[in-house]
C-alpha cells in the first residue's frame, strides 16, 4: 500500500526514525499466545515496536475489517506484555484505511478497536481513502492530491506531537 510508504516518508521528513513493515514482512505464522520461542520475523516486528514512540498502521478494507495478516501481526504485539510499555501502551498510532467503496470506515473502526485493546492511542484523525484517493499516491510516496496531502500532514503532526508530549512525561 503506497499510502503507508507516503506516511513513512513524511514521518522521516519530520525527523522521525522510521521502519516500514509491508506485506512481505507480515508473512508470519498464526499467532499463538503460548509460543515457547518467537520466530525471527516476529521477534523483529516485536523488537521494532518495542523501540517505537509511535506507529502508523495502514490497511485495505477486507469485508468490513482488515486483512488476516495484519490482524495476526497486531496480535503478536501482546508479546510486548513483559516490556516496560506493554502492547502499544501510550503510543500514538496513526491509522489509514483504503477501500473500493464505503468499507474504509469499517476497516478504520476495526483498527481503532484493536489499537485500543493493545493500549495504544489512535490519533484523533484516522484517514479513510477511496481507491481514487489511493491512486493519488505514487510508488515513491509522492501525493498528487492537495487534500490527501493535507490530511497526511495533520496525521503526521498528531503522531509526532503525541510522541513528543509522552517523551517529556517520562
Place the predicted regions along the sequence by residue.
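Hydrophobic/aromatic beta-strand patches that form the interior of the parallel beta-sheet core
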Residues: 21, 94-96, 123, 127-129
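A generic structural motif
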Residues: 14-19, 120-122
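Structural signal for well-ordered, non-membrane alpha-helices
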Residues: 8, 53, 156-160
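Glycine-rich phosphate/pyrophosphate-binding loop and the adjoining helix
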Residues: 121-170
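Hydrophobic alpha-helical membrane-association signature
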Residues: 2-4, 41, 107, 155
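N-terminal beta1-alpha1 ligand-phosphate binding loop
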Residues: 1-16
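Helix-loop-strand module that forms the ligand-binding subsite of alpha/beta enzymes
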Residues: 40-118
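N-terminal beta-loop-helix "entrance" segment that forms/cooperates
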Residues: 23-40, 135-140
Amino acid at each position: 500500500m503506497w499510502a503507508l510508504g507516503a506516511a513513512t516518508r513524511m514521518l522521516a521528513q519530520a525527523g522521525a526514525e522510521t521502519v516500514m513493515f509491508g506485506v512481505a514482512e507480515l508473512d508470519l505464522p498464526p499467532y499463538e499466545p503460548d509460543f515457547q520461542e518467537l520466530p525471527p520475523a516476529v521477534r523483529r516486528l516485536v523488537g521494532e515496536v518495542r523501540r517505537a514512540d509511535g506507529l502508523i498502521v495502514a490497511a485495505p478494507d477486507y469485508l468490513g475489517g482488515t486483512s488476516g495478516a495484519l490482524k495476526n501481526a497486531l496480535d503478536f504485539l501482546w508479546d510486548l506484555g513483559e516490556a516496560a510499555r506493554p502492547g502499544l501502551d501510550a503510543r500514538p498510532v496513526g491509522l489509514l484505511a483504503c477501500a473500493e467503496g464505503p468499507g474504509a470506515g469499517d476497516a478504520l473502526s476495526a483498527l481503532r478497536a484493536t489499537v485500543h485493546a493493545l493500549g495504544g492511542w489512535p490519533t484523533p484523525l484516522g484517514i479513510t481513502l477511496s481507491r481514487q484517493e489511493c491512486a493519488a499516491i505514487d510508488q515513491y510516496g509522492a501525493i498528487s492530491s492537495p487534500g490527501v496531502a493535507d490530511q497526511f500532514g495533520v496525521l503526521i503532526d498528531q503522531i509526532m506531537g503525541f510522541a513528543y508530549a509522552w517523551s517529556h512525561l517520562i
